[in-house]
């Protein structure tokens, strides 16, 4: 399964925020600079992450963005569920004439479930804790 760039950059943005001290705010501009992604694209991603509670956004002069909850409580599977369209096939009887007898959708759904269960066994904190190479690459002190 390949994640969309939306989910990929959502995970990267969360990893960046998780690598910062818990009370430190960052900005969308800073995140886009670190990853070289379009600001407009990142704004949409951060808005979605904010809607589901993974990011807190504060407006104003001293505003910015930061994790909406502790990194150790954010499971990677939950992030993917919030950002990724998880339907792998378009099973519509007008589109595919084998839909009534097809078993492929069930197998694919089980594969997605297994994938998400594996991601659920890892948190955002697991991605950043004791990872000095990551901090160096992200230029985080």
Swiss-Prot record:
Which UniProt keywords are given for this protein, alphabetically ordered? 2Fe-2S, DNA-binding, Iron, Iron-sulfur, Metal-binding, Repressor, Transcription, Transcription regulation
Does the keyword section mention DNA-binding?
yes
Share an example GO biological-process annotation for this protein: negative regulation of DNA-templated transcription
Report the co-factor binding details.
Answer: Binds 1 [2Fe-2S] cluster per subunit.
Annotated residues for binding of [2Fe-2S] cluster: 91, 96, 102
What cofactor is needed?
Answer: [2Fe-2S] cluster
Gene Ontology terms for molecular function: 2 iron, 2 sulfur cluster binding; DNA-binding transcription factor activity; double-stranded DNA binding; iron ion binding
Q: Which domain of life is it from?
A: Bacteria
Q: Would you tell me the Gene Ontology cellular component terms?
A: cytosol
Recorded coiled-coil stretches: none
User: Does the keyword field hold Transcription regulation?
Assistant: yes
Q: Where the record puts its DNA-binding region(s)?
A: 28-51
| HTH rrf2-type domain segment(s) | 2-129
What does the protein in this record do? Nitric oxide-sensitive repressor of genes involved in protecting the cell against nitrosative stress. May require iron for activity.
Extract the HAMAP family matched here: HTH_type_NsrR
For this entry, the protein name equals HTH-type transcriptional repressor NsrR
Organism of origin is Serratia proteamaculans (strain 568)
């Amino acid at each position: 399964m390949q994640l969309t760039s939306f989910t990929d950059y959502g995970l990267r943005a969360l990893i960046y925020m998780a690598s910062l001290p818990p009370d430190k705010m960052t900005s969308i501009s800073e995140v886009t600079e670190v990853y070289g992604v379009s600001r407009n694209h990142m704004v949409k991603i951060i808005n979605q992450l904010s809607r589901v509670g993974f990011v807190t956004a504060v407006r104003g002069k001293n505003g910015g963005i930061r994790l909406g909850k502790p990194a150790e409580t954010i499971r990677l599977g939950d992030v993917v569920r919030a950002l990724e369209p998880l339907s792998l096939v378009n099973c519509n009887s007008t589109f595919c004439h084998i839909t009534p007898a097809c078993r492929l959708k069930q197998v694919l759904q089980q594969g997605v479930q297994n994938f998400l269960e594996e991601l659920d066994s890892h948190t955002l904190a697991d991605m950043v804790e004791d990872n000095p190479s990551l901090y160096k690459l992200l230029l985080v002190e």
